[in-house]
Amino acid sequence: MKSNTFLTEVTWKVTSVALLMLLITGFSILAGCNKKSSIAETAPAGERLTGYVNEDAQPESTGSNNGYFWSLYREGGSGSITFGNAGNFAISYSNVTDIVGGKGWNPGSARNIGYNVGALSGSYNFVGIYGWTTSPLIEYYVAEMGNVTGGTFINNVSSDGHSYSFYKSLRVDAPSIIGTATFWQYKDTWGGSSTGSNRSVNMTNHINNWRNSGGQGFGSYNYQILALEAWGTKSGYINATVW
């Protein structure tokens, strides 16, 4: 009888431990499921964009996405670019010395560019068309929002119902698409665009004026993008689409 009682007690204890382990395992599985659901429900809107996210573009990252070229350059701070469908992109940046990036084409051309800036917050210096040529090496801007004047005023050019001021300046031993170099900047500034509406930029008008009045010609097309640039310890965000 003692032997049977001992076996009964052992059996009861083993059964109790097994049941306890099953309960703990089940609770852990449920907790894990709830955690995943919570993460999915609170994911930032920017993370719902599909495509590549570059967390640390320094000094420059480039690539292609959905048939478009993209570029992101950064000095200091932090910055990332995220891609949506077609020509959509979003850039977030914090405490940057300089950041310039966006989406477009490589090579560029004298095309008619459409764009829509859906969201823009924080501090920035420029939003518009940005690109480069080689032979000669030229960095060019068409400022739809913000201001990139500075240097020598050349003339005014009319395009898309607006008057742009053309400024030209020389950069000496500065970062470029071929490394540190000396090159000219061509900068057309209007600055009157706004968020949430479809706009267009006829690059033929700008390029013809640069070629005829810039004094350096225009060179061979390198990349050409709808871009944001911010410098001077700025932070902000843009979500825009180009076509």
Residue ranges and their predicted role:
Residues 3-19:
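Bacterial N-terminal signal peptides that target proteins for export
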Residues 136-196:
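An exposed acidic His-Trp-rich patch
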Residues 1-5, 26-53:
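Bacterial Sec-dependent N-terminal signal peptides
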Residues 199-243:
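Long, compositionally biased interface segments
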Residues 98-159:
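Extracellular-facing segments of soluble proteins and assemblies that are Gly/Ser/Thr-biased and enriched
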Residues 52-123:
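Short N-terminal edge-element motif at the start of the domain
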Residues 16-28:
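Bacterial N-terminal signal peptides
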Residues 65-69, 73-86, 157-172, 188, ...:
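Extracellular-facing/secreted segment signature in eukaryotic proteins
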